[in-house]
A protein has these predicted regions:
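Hydrophobic, aromatic-enriched alpha-helical segments typical of multi-pass transmembrane helices
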Residues: 1-208
Length: 208
């Protein structure tokens, strides 16, 4: 599905456009320096995420059409939460870049701390989306390979919840390496795969 590919390209570009914000162990003036250096790229990143989210909505909508019963309702709620969390996080990160020359250290540190909790909390919404896909794949509504990927994604996200309480300057710190370098790419791969699977014909026995 074109929407899945568009989502993956846009989100991957957004992920690579700007280096990660200084971690929770860094002082506010490091964040101010980062924002001043990358303010234009941060706003471009927000634009890429915005258009990527539109493509993601299409993927989620078509996926929901193949789900039934309670898993379908859970998927709907999870999809909505994913999108809301993405937009809220984007508000904060893009907002930092609007007036970089007027940004104070304390303000920068506070806003970045809030944005840093996006990845850790997003894990729960991702599980709410991945598990219904896994169940549907077991019922033959999606290819088995997608079910395996959904299981891997759900388990990884469950483990990644540890970043909610992870210590500073560690792999599992909030908004740190685990969220950005492991969870982020896997998030993109899963929804790309979901879009690809949706472009494939359903087995005849599960078609309505």
């Amino acid at each position: 599905m074109i929407a899945g590919i568009a989502f993956a390209v846009l989100f991957a570009a957004a992920l690579l456009t700007v280096p990660t914000l200084p971690g929770i162990d860094k002082p506010g003036y490091d964040i101010v320096s980062h924002v001043n250096e990358h303010s234009g790229a941060m706003r471009m990143q927000s634009l890429l995420v915005t258009f990527g989210s539109l493509a993601l909505v299409v993927v989620l909508g078509y996926a929901r059409d193949r789900l039934t019963g309670p898993p379908g309702y859970v998927f709907t709620i999870g999809s909505a939460v994913v999108l809301v969390e993405v937009f809220i996080a984007t508000w904060f990160t893009a907002g930092l870049a609007l007036h970089p020359d007027q940004l104070g250290s304390a303000t920068a540190r506070t806003i970045t701390d809030i944005a840093s909790m996006w990845g850790p909390i997003l894990t729960v919404a991702d599980i709410m989306v991945a598990v219904p896909i896994l169940l549907a794949a077991n019922d033959g509504r999606f290819p088995r390979w997608l079910g395996i990927l959904a299981a891997v994604f759900a388990v990884e996200q469950l483990i990644e919840t540890i970043t909610i309480i992870g210590p500073p300057a560690s792999f599992i710190s909030p908004g740190g390496a685990m969220n950005f370098y492991l969870g982020g790419p896997l998030f993109i791969v899963f929804f790309l795969a979901l879009g690809v699977a949706l472009s494939m014909e359903q087995p005849a026995e599960v078609q309505e």
